[in-house]
């Protein structure tokens, strides 16, 4: 690898990963600076409080730094670190035994909240109408780019259950975010 650049800000993520794998901490610092808010935003969407999102994001970047040599560049660094963060957050939930409570809450939260075209809200507000399990499933499949199978494995739920939560969550979001003219919103899943 050629000499170290004076500034890492102009380098592509793949180049930064190479420098970081060679032990250059400043290169990884630039990666964390670039992608830290997106990771925290994903965690907030998954239901983490601000301080908890900060803690999990910090842990995820520490894990990514320790495992940077494992990053093969098959996807983006951003997607890789988001998957690490999502999995760490889910493990945290499991440790606190919240997943059992989430499944019970899901049954109670079956009512669909309709959207009033005059009072349309943004996606963050719309996500609040989802049950916690729906929010987790939608966030993992669309925010972190996991497949339904990967989300099912991460949540330790049957594949069909995850698909149902995603479908129901998307229906609620479409209803809540429906444009005034009644046009249908199209959803797109992330990579994975």
Regions found by a protein language model. Name each.
Residues 21-22, 47-48, 58-76, 95-96, ...:
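Sigma70-family region 2
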Residues 66-73, 83-103, 179:
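Arg/Lys-rich amphipathic alpha helix in sigma70-family domain 2
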Residues 2-7, 153-154, 170-192:
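C-terminal edge and immediately downstream basic/flexible tail or linker adjoining helix-turn-helix-like DNA-binding
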Residues 2-7, 21-30, 40-59:
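Short, charged helix-capping/linker segments at alpha-helix termini
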Residues 30-50, 67, 127, 176-179:
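Amphipathic, Lys/Arg- and hydrophobic-enriched alpha-helical face
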Residues 20, 39, 43, 53-64, ...:
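Short, small-hydrophobic-rich alpha-helical interface motif
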Residues 128-136, 140, 144-161, 172:
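Helix-turn-helix DNA-binding module
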């Amino acid at each position: 690898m050629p000499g170290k650049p004076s500034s890492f800000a102009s380098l592509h993520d793949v180049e930064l990963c190479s420098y970081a794998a060679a032990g250059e901490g400043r290169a990884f610092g630039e990666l964390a600076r670039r992608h830290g808010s997106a990771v925290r935003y994903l965690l907030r969407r998954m239901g983490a409080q601000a301080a908890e999102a900060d803690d999990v994001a910090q842990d995820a970047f520490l894990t990514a730094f320790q495992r940077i040599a494992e990053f093969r560049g098959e996807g983006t660094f951003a997607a890789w670190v988001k998957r690490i963060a999502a999995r760490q957050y889910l493990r945290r939930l499991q440790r606190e035994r919240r997943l059992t409570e989430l499944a019970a809450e899901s049954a109670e939260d079956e009512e669909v909240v309709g959207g009033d075209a005059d009072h349309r809200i943004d996606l963050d507000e719309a996500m609040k109408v989802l049950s916690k399990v729906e929010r987790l499933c939608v966030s993992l499949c669309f925010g972190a780019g996991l497949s339904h199978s990967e989300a099912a494995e991460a949540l330790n739920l049957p594949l069909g259950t995850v698909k149902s939560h995603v479908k129901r969550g998307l229906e609620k979001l479409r209803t809540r975010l429906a444009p005034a003219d009644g046009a249908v919103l199209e959803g797109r899943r992330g990579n994975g």
